[in-house]
Regions:
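Blade-loop segments of beta-propeller domains
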Residues: 56-86
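Structural motif
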Residues: 43-49, 91-98, 135-140, 177-186, ...
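A short beta-strand motif characteristic of beta-propeller blades
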Residues: 11-18, 57-65, 106-111, 145-151, ...
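Repeated scaffold domains used in trafficking and secretory/extracellular systems
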Residues: 21-28, 67-76, 113-124, 154-164, ...
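Short loop/turn segments immediately following the C-termini of beta-strands
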Residues: 39-41, 87-89, 132-134, 173-176, ...
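Short loop/turn segments that connect beta-strands within beta-propeller blades
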Residues: 52-56, 100-105, 141-145, 188-192, ...
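Loop/turn-rich, solvent-exposed surfaces of beta-rich toroidal or solenoidal domains
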Residues: 153-189
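Beta-strand-rich domains and repeat architectures in extracellular enzymes and scaffolds
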Residues: 15-46, 71-74
């Protein structure tokens, strides 16, 4: 659906998430469940958490780090799998892209990528990754072949992105520090040119709403901007 224009967001509620979430990264929402990736920088561990969406109750947790690759990022899912990038904690570092079962969180398969993949979206034809600060896009086949790489024409630093409504929906920041603006961008999936942009504010803790995880499902925008105690913000989207 090229040319989609987002014209209104209404905050419906926020859901406190149970337990220590460390430094949150990406989210995925489906079937009454919420999945969250997170990194414990002190212990050098990566985490995948599963929650009951309605209540924020934690259901399961799995460690995802592999060697020096401890930093999971923004991620996505298909019908039965979660596709999660877990990278070395530095620009240009290697990444292992893991395919994990939504039913059990167990690792099903994986492949390595020669760059730090900080966000990953599942497309019908493969996997779209964005590197550190989203300066480049990389496209992989589902069996791990790097098919192409190209520069991101947008200045935003995307943390999480999904293929929704025929576009790439990417959430992140424009600018840095106190001047950073929270944005959700709709990108053309072939050219990555901007179709639409919605600018959001900050939480009552002063954190930009798109600081970390994002998903868009059934007319609802889900944002997880804050580390522990983490809150999932739910917005109604009106087109």
């Amino acid at each position: 659906m090229h040319g989609l224009v987002l014209f209104a967001l209404t905050l419906l509620r926020f859901i406190p998430l149970e337990g220590e979430t460390c430094h949150v990264q990406g989210i995925a929402v489906d079937g009454g469940r919420l999945w969250v990736t997170s990194v414990d920088r002190t212990a050098r561990k990566g985490w995948l958490f599963e929650y009951e969406l309605e209540t924020g109750r934690r259901l399961r947790a799995a460690e995802v780090q592999q060697g020096e690759m401890v930093h999971p990022g923004g991620f996505d899912h298909d019908g039965e799998s979660l596709w999660i990038p877990v990278a070395e904690y530095r620009p240009g570092g290697k990444t292992v892209i893991q395919r994990r079962s939504k039913a059990t969180l167990e690792l099903m398969s994986s492949f390595e990528a020669p760059d730090h993949i900080g966000a990953l979206a599942v497309l019908p034809e493969g996997l779209l990754g964005a590197n550190w600060d989203a300066r480049q896009f990389h496209f992989f086949s589902l069996d791990g072949k790097l098919l192409w790489s190209r520069a991101n024409p947008q200045p935003a630093r995307y943390q999480d992105m999904k293929r929704r409504y025929g576009a790439i929906v990417a959430a992140g920041l424009l600018g840095r520090g106190a001047d950073a603006r929270a944005v959700v961008d709709w990108l053309d999936p072939e050219t990555f040119m901007l179709l639409s942009r919605e600018t959001l504010g900050r939480t009552d803790r002063g954190v930009p709403f798109t600081n970390e995880g994002m998903d868009l499902r059934d007319g609802l925008l889900y944002l997880l901007p804050e580390d522990a105690p983490s809150r999932l913000f739910v917005f109604r989207v009106e087109y």
